[in-house]
């Protein structure tokens, strides 16, 4: 018995601050047959270009990533300025929500290995990375 199903995965727009990971992502999206556009954009520039890219590609899913970590002098996990790029990711999420106001319009994944999870979720990401969850995996 053969059952044929049409599966719609949605169009992906992926912004990544690291060229190596951008290139890897393109490779994996192609292998999986996903409809994805990957742009290598430094974290600090992502918020300023996200609306233009959303208008151009009209994705269902937005992935915002790059590198992030606590700064060496940072001791307060609840201060966004103690993270290298979390504020840039949060700003990009806020800008993107001007275009896709709800998760039905645009699903947003944001952050990197050690991002400020709570700030990304408050910015209205649907999914985010967490430093405490990710650090535990490598200790």
Language-model segments: which ranges?
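Acidic, metal-coordinating helix/loop segments flanking the phosphotransfer/catalytic sites
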Residues: 44-58
């Amino acid at each position: 018995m053969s059952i044929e199903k049409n599966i719609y995965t949605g169009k992906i727009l992926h912004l990544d601050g690291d060229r190596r990971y951008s290139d890897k992502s393109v490779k994996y999206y192609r292998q999986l047959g996903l409809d994805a556009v990957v742009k290598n954009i430094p974290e600090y520039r992502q918020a300023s270009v996200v609306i233009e890219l959303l208008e151009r590609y009209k994705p269902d899913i937005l992935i915002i990533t790059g590198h992030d970590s606590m700064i060496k002098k940072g001791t307060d996990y609840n201060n966004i300025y103690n993270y290298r790029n979390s504020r840039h990711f949060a700003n990009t999420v806020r800008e993107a929500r001007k275009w896709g106001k709800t998760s039905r319009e645009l699903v947003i994944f944001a952050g990197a290995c050690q991002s400020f999870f709570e700030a990304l979720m408050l910015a209205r990401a649907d999914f985010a990375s967490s430093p405490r969850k990710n650090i535990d995996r490598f200790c």
